């Protein structure tokens, strides 16, 4: 009923998640309570600003994204030289 029966619980309701690695994947529901896996989009809520800060863009390597701003400034050059126009 109350506190004594809580000690009898020994089955895991959550196991490791394939996406985020946390022990938040609900075995019966087949969804992660942390990242929302297997949903395509990551789970994030506005009431959890601290949690958002931990896992948003910029907390990892950003192997691709960190170069995009520089390439944007130059107009995404492809490496092919522009055709020379004869000056008048």
From Swiss-Prot:
Its cofactor is Zn(2+). Gene3D superfamilies: 2.20.25.30. One of its GO terms (cellular component) is cytosolic large ribosomal subunit. A zinc finger (C4-type) spans 17-35. The keyword Ribosomal protein applies. Binds 1 zinc ion per subunit. It comes from the Eukaryota. One of its GO terms (biological process) is translation. Binds to the 23S rRNA. Belongs to the eukaryotic ribosomal protein eL37 family. PANTHER family: 60S RIBOSOMAL PROTEIN L37, RIBOSOMAL PROTEIN L37. This is Large ribosomal subunit protein eL37. The gene is RPL37.
